[in-house]
Amino acid sequence: MANGWTGNILRVNLTTGNITLEDSSKFKSFVGGMGFGYKIMYDEVPPGTKPFDEANKLVFATGPLTGSGAPCSSRVNITSLSTFTKGNLVVDAHMGGFFAAQMKFAGYDVIIIEGKAKSPVWLKIKDDKVSLEKADFLWGKGTRATTEEICRLTSPETCVAAIGQAGENLVPLSGMLNSRNHSGGAGTGAIMGSKNLKAIAVEGTKGVNIADRQEMKRLNDYMMTELIGANNNHVVPSTPQSWAEYSDPKSRWTARKGLFWGAAEGGPIETGEIPPGNQNTVGFRTYKSVFDLGPAAEKYTVKMSGCHSCPIRCMTQMNIPRVKEFGVPSTGGNTCVANFVHTTIFPNGPKDFEDKDDGRVIGNLVGLNLFDDYGLWCNYGQLHRDFTYCYSKGVFKRVLPAEEYAEIHWDQLEAGDVNFIKDFYYRLAHRVGELSHLADGSYAIAERWNLGEEYWGYAKNKLWSPFGYPVHHANEASAQVGSIVNCMFNRDCMTHTHINFIGSGLPLKLQREVAKELFGSEDAYDETKNYTPINDAKIKYAKWSLLRVCLHNAVTLCNWVWPMTVSPLKSRNYRGDLALEAKFFKAITGEEMTQEKLDLAAERIFTLHRACTVKLMQTKDMRNEHDLICSWVFDKDPQIPVFTEGTDKMDRDDMHASLTMFYKEMGWDPQLGCPTRETLQRLGLEDIAADLAAHNLLPV
């Protein structure tokens, strides 16, 4: 596999110290990334394995587009067993930054970590030179200091994925950080900690071979000038502008006249109006600090940054000198939930310092710097919602020992004092006291603290599944489509295919026209909170959403931007190009490829995930044992009938029918929701079919 892929799997056994090289071409039908991860986990991790067992694996896998220069392609898929949900099933973390590109430049499609080191180590990779190094001097340090120490020992060009104290202490809600603020969550930090692996440091100098460089450049120019929008591929500006036919205040295309990077080096830089067509100004479109935190963030924003080979630049970079008062660096940044979640625990809001709402900006920079340095992970905000629930409902007063409860500064919490965040995160990362169990995850605290149905059924807490993971663009995002999507994985679904389309900013009429072209009927697309019962077009929409996220996690593209469903250009009638992944695939690998072939590969990967879940759960009955939804989704808004304007609640009978229709569309058993032998064979998964049959896990 000379083009796109490197052809190499690096296997590191921490128990024996053996480091070996394998051929990744044996997994080629699974494309890369997520596909490689699931196949390795299915083959090598038996049912009954626990997350912290030596038998568990940690699989870092990239795809053929990563490292090629394709836009938004620096993603690595990290697959292991969940530390934080019921059943400890297979899950993925999705990490951006520069780690994935450096993996490819060093010559590896996959890194498999197995076993457990006797004492702390870090993995050093410089092209073909790979070694395990002692990490005793790093143990106890945060992710930032660990990265700095390793870069001093190696090179400033080294990319380090490191855990902090949370991972060392096996905190289930922990992750790893690379390139300062780019995280891989889903408990993978604790998996590394359980293996005594402090960090993986990689530097590559080889590059990625591209079959057709001229076509690659043409596709890049085409995407950058005609197709790409802003963060989440929103394709209209958030304010009316001279060049734009449409605008939408919810759009992440936030650039406008009078909006500045207020703390830029050399003086403020105006984002201005950024019409499509000029690829050199795409990076000004998205302004996440103001979008996430409000106008008070403008004067502290240095610039937007982002991942390797990404023009969108969705990562805020801020400089707030006064945060040093709280013992953290004055600079930092992130995007989305990580930008704003930290001050949500304050029942009366954060306390302002000098300007209106600056408490939210300052408090969140303090919070995210601490959170990232400790290597904590918020489970898409669920950690903080669980805190709010337990505080407001008196759970902490009931379950914390009296001495511990008395020593916590609840007065700081009520006052919106940032010092409370410091103490709270320290306790979580160092597992101090009963409160620290909050970071065990929702399922664990519900069991440990006997929270009962009130907890699971509380709408504001946003728990989607009784397995202990939250909503991630679910019933509020295209009704049954988002609801089906949220049922399918073993953590929050991390699927943005459908929400990017919904949030594009285009008017409803245009979106429904596009839906008809893609899914056969305008009825695939409902206006938000004005839903209709399930239909065949919605099922096709749900399947497409899931297959595209699996495809992106296999070729390793960013599903926050891809696919190019719509365009910002009126001259294209705002139509995108859903064959673009296949066009890049062909240009990079040299292999003939179509949209349909890639969709089939994605279906193979998605069905393998389902088979892996069946095997680990040791049950065929996915409908009644896995695809479960918390009661609030059906019981919210009791005064508004379902399928009435003004509510996004779902109907139980309609969701039952939706799942049945979706199972049929996937070729799974329509009652059980598990893959059939026929479908597994159609997808080239004969070995999986034989294994499931041997364990009586195929439907009759």
Question: PLM ranges: what are they?
Answer:
Residues 1-64, 70-72, 163-165, 182:
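N-terminal amphipathic, basic-rich helices that act as targeting or association modules
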Residues 4, 19-20, 24, 65-72, ...:
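Extended catalytic cores of very large enzyme megasubunits
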Residues 8-13, 20, 59, 102, ...:
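Structured core elements
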Residues 14-17, 25-26, 63-67, 83, ...:
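Short, glycine-/Ser/Thr-/acidic-enriched flexible segments
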Residues 39-122, 130-133, 137-147:
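Feature captures the catalytic cores and cofactor-binding loops of soluble hydro-lyases/lyases
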Residues 53, 74-76, 151-186, 192-700:
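Extended C-terminal regions of large enzymes
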Residues 96-128, 194-208, 379-387:
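Glycine-rich phosphate/pyrophosphate-binding loops
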Residues 126-148, 404-413, 698-700:
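Short, basic, helix/turn surface patches
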